[in-house]
Amino acid sequence: MSGMQISSYLRKYLADEDKKIREEFKESDPNNEMILWMHEKTRITEEDLARPYTEDEVRELCLRTKVKVNMTAWNCLWEAKKRFDAKGRFERKSEEFINLMYLKAVRRKMVQPYPEDYVAQRREIAAAETKKDNISRLDRWQKQKRRNQSAHATQPDSQDNEVVEIHDDTNRYSVSQAVALPVLTPSDLSGIGDDEDEQQQQHHHHKHRSGFQNEHADCPETQMRCDQADSGRLPNGPTNSESDPDYYMFGTQLSRSIQPTSTQEADDQLACPETEMNESWVRCDQINSESMSIGPSINSDGSISFQNSGSEPIDVDVN
């Protein structure tokens, strides 16, 4: 795309603008140094206007730049509208009335249309400013592209170096493990741990059984059941799973209607020393057997009695 042809009016306009800025901001003043530097970077030159666009630049500008059309520039009707809006003449009015007011403003010369030469000159200045802005955009985008390409070019090298370092560390770690760990042949591993588990299980079973027998050695019932379990013979009839001696040791009275029945209950209680009642307790005529109850008792009809629930057990020493 060819460059923009600069006219004599535009050349004179740019020269006048540059002269006006330099007269207002003197170079002798150090405070104006930044303003003059910005003016030098942003002012429109003939080289900028003569620079042609490539096809890629035109495509990039069309895709990345928003097109805006200013319909109010050099429009006399817009100026008339601003005057009527300031007076409130268009409030709650129809479109026909508004158009008639525009015609009235032009006929009475409230506003005058801009000359075509003036509009063409203003458009030429706006086109020069737009091209300067587009050149600045293209230069900025080009710098960003080069910066991104250099960043992508250096990033794979650093990643390759990190991968090589990790690979070297892994190799050194594997080599150190291979040197530290001894190599065992299948012949060395044979026989290791074969009989240890069986011996430990047998020892644990024997220890558990001997401990259980020692704890219940005093009770003939437990001894009989242990002997039957060892010999593989268990009684066919129902057995009392609850520990009956515990209830008699703590003085808890159970009704005969709810006590568990067993065929071996009488023999077990007579044979076990813990369930035998001392004869000295029977000879004591002054002791009430009901006062020995610590907690609530159950009557024969199934009701719960709280009689003497707060009494404490009395120990009588006959000897």
Curated annotation (Swiss-Prot):
This is Telomere-binding protein cav. It comes from Drosophila yakuba. Disulfide bonds: none annotated. GO terms for biological process: telomere capping. The keyword Cell membrane does not apply. One of its GO terms (molecular function) is telomeric DNA binding. It is found in: Nucleus; Chromosome, Telomere. Residues 107-312 are annotated as: Required for binding to Su(var)205. Multiple telomeric associations (TAs) in the same metaphase spread often result in multicentric linear chromosomes that resemble little 'trains' of chromosomes, hence the name 'caravaggio', an Italian train. A motif (Su(var)205-binding Pro-containing repeat 1) lies at residues 220-224. GO terms for cellular component: chromosome, centromeric region; nucleus; telomere cap complex. Keywords: Chromosome, DNA-binding, Nucleus, Repeat, Telomere. Coiled coil: none annotated. A motif (Su(var)205-binding Pro-containing repeat 2) lies at residues 273-279. Binds to chromosome ends in a sequence-dependent manner and is required for telomere capping. Interacts (via C-terminus) with Su(var)205 dimer (via hinge and chromoshadow domain) and with moi to form the terminin, telomere-capping, complex. Interacts with HP6, which is also part of the terminin complex. The lineage of its organism: Eukaryota, Metazoa, Ecdysozoa, Arthropoda, Hexapoda. Residues 291-311 have a biased composition (Polar residues). Residues 141-163, 186-248, 291-319 are annotated as: Disordered.
